[in-house]
């Protein structure tokens, strides 16, 4: 079960601390660097070009990641698919056949380029990129009077199978799509879609899933998130994209806009669209807290409510990070991200190779505007 936590809160983290970065590969307009142990992948160009850059610069990582996902773990697990229990690949191939009519050409072109560059079968790359459709999530949001200052903050906790080794292929992916909006995607080698991201127009988006398995006739969740980041400049445009697009299953989202200091949760399911406003009671959220949208379930939801109430009006950067500590973050905590959309700053922590939860590991600090200003020839990269 894939569970993801989101936070939107208001506070400020201090200045970014420059860290030595090393350029380790180039391909066309794309390039790869390593900073403080974290891979940062820069992609630029057409969908095909970006896919080729991704595949060639991270060929070994992609081959290893897909082998684990599709051959090793994919042959061990069974998933529910209607009344049947199927291996994940079999189920995903059936989903692809249903959803293909709703997948934009640019997405398939980028996956084809990635497969060519990484020297993997195109169907393997396609199946891996549809894995997020099998899983569902949870989340929370805090803002305005709930915090110590007025800076909009959007945080995210991803809990998912650290024993699958995704953290060994973790990326900060900085994309400049031809004709589109530049954005950052916190992701893994071989993945083209997005589940955690922010663009240069100060829009950040996160996803959390519910039920509705089997309702696949729509745009895949990770594709829709990626599309929003590279096409939407405003809060209203983002909401309208979700409202008007054919959707799948039951998904909840958090959308934040640093330009207007505005954020909301929303349900964008196959048959329902509803904004989940901060501080407003919802049938799934029985304990509303002023200026907060706490989207989670069970004991984790109760703990979030307790933590937020205890610090309401006093939440700072440090205390906001603590809101996402275990057991709000599960033992399988794969990555944590905090976005400050107004400044495009963000902080990332990944699980350790030994399975140490991301919440128990240090954060690396970045700023999207600064990442986009970098070149592989800059002196401070050597």
Set out the residue ranges of the language-model regions.
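Sec/Tat signal peptide C-region and signal peptidase I cleavage site
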Residues: 17-21
């Amino acid at each position: 079960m894939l569970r993801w936590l989101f936070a939107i809160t208001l506070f400020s983290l201090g200045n970014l601390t420059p860290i030595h970065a090393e350029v380790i590969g180039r391909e066309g307009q794309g390039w790869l660097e390593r900073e403080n142990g974290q891979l940062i992948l820069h992609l630029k160009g057409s969908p095909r070009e970006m896919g080729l850059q991704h595949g060639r610069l991270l060929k070994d990582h992609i081959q290893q990641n897909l082998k684990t996902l599709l051959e090793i773990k994919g042959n061990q697990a069974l998933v529910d698919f209607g009344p049947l229990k199927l291996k994940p690949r079999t189920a995903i191939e059936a989903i692809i056949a249903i959803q293909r009519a709703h997948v934009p050409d640019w997405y398939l072109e980028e996956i084809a380029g990635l497969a060519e560059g990484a020297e993997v079968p195109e169907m393997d790359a396609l199946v891996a990129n549809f894995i997020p459709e099998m899983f569902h999530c949870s989340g929370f949001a805090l803002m305005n009077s709930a915090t110590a200052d007025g800076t909009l903050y959007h945080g995210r906790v991803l809990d998912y199978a650290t024993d699958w080794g995704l953290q060994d292929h973790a990326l900060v992916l900085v994309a400049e799509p031809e004709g589109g909006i530049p954005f950052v995607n916190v992701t893994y080698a071989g993945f083209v879609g997005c589940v955690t991201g922010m663009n240069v127009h100060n829009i950040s988006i996160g996803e959390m899933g519910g039920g509705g398995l089997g309702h696949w006739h729509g745009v895949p969740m990770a594709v829709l998130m990626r599309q929003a980041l590279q096409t939407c400049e405003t809060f209203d445009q983002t909401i309208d994209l979700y409202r008007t697009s054919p959707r799948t299953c039951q998904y909840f989202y958090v959308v934040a806009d640093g330009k207007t200091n505005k954020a909301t949760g929303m349900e964008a399911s196959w048959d329902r669209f509803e904004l989940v406003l901060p501080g407003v009671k919802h049938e799934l959220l029985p304990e509303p807290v002023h200026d907060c949208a706490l989207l989670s379930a069970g004991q984790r939801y109760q703990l979030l409510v307790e933590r937020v109430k205890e610090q309401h009006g006093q939440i700072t950067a440090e205390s906001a990070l603590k809101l996402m500590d275990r057991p709000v973050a599960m033992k399988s905590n794969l990555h944590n991200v905090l976005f400050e959309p107004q400044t495009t700053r963000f902080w990332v922590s990944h699980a350790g190779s030994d399975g140490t939860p991301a919440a128990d590991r240090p954060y690396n600090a970045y700023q999207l505007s600064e990442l986009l200003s970098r070149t592989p020839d800059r002196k401070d990269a050597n």
